[in-house]
């Protein structure tokens, strides 16, 4: 049996050279491939997307404590890019702490500090992870006259002070929807491999040397899960 559709989990691959090799293989085999960063499927983000004025930049900020920055940055990058519509971004690591810590998952690493992503259309994503954080984690999205706060874990979106309740999504509830979309339409709402791989490569090409330098490693791969 030949494979028609493939959905890969993030973080895609730890080595930069893997991305082009896999891309060639998928094209050679004719396999349509997406990457499972599912916020694009969330009702809350679809609602926020409907409020975005596409001609104006998106300013997206998320701050939390111990939320697994290395592991989960790509999720925020993916939805940020979906909201602002740009094709690529610049990634700044100047405000990261010069320390690499062990991840909760054995054999992997984590970082703290602030990551900043900017696009040619003036959009900015700021992600902050601090051990001292004791507030309520939320995404703050500014665009035009709108200030939007999204409390993902509570299913609450506040737009200019007005509360809207949205479903809290779990992967168990999204997998069936995703399969139905693929079988019925031959496509889905996730980023395709080419899009997501470009985000992964842009992130990994900065974060891998940063981590390897601090750890004194000479490997070309980086243990991000």
Please identify what each model-predicted range represents:
Residues 3, 30, 55-59, 112:
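A general structural motif
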Residues 1-4, 19, 27-28, 101, ...:
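N-terminal glycine-/serine-/threonine-rich beta1-alpha1-beta2 phosphate-ribose binding loop
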Residues 1-40:
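Beta-strand-loop-alpha-helix segment that lines the small-molecule cofactor/substrate pocket
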Residues 105-110, 116-182, 187-194:
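NAD(P)-dinucleotide binding in Rossmann-like oxidoreductases
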Residues 1-4, 180-225:
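C-terminal helix-rich "cap/oligomerization" subdomain common to oxidoreductases
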Residues 59-134, 194-197:
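Rossmann-like dinucleotide-binding domain that binds NAD(P)(H)
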Residues 20, 42-43, 71-81, 172-177, ...:
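A structural signal for well-ordered alpha-helical segments within the folded catalytic domains
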Residues 43-59:
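Rossmann-like NAD(P)H-binding beta-loop-alpha module
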């Amino acid at each position: 049996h030949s494979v028609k559709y493939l959905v890969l989990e993030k973080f895609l691959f730890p080595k930069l050279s893997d991305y082009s090799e896999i891309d060639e293989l998928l094209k050679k085999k004719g396999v349509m491939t997406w990457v499972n960063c599912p916020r694009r499927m969330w009702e809350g983000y679809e609602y926020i997307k409907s409020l975005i004025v596409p001609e104006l930049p998106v300013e997206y900020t998320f701050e939390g404590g111990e939320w697994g920055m290395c592991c989960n940055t790509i999720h925020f990058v993916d939805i940020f890019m979906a909201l602002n519509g740009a094709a690529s971004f610049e990634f700044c690591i100047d405000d990261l702490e010069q320390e690499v810590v062990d991840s909760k998952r054995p054999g992997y690493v984590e970082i703290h500090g602030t990551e900043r992503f900017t696009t040619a259309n003036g959009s900015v994503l700021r992600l902050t992870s601090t051990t001292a954080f004791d507030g309520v984690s939320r995404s703050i999205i500014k665009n035009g006259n709108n200030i939007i706060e999204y409390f993902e874990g509570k299913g609450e979106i506040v737009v200019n002070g007005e509360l809207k309740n949205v479903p809290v999504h779990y992967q168990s509830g999204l997998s069936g929807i995703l399969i139905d979309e693929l079988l019925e339409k031959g496509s889905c709402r996730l980023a395709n491999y080419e899009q997501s791989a470009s985000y992964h490569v842009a992130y990994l090409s900065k974060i891998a040397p940063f981590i390897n330098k601090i750890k004194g490693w000479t490997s070309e791969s980086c243990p991000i899960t």
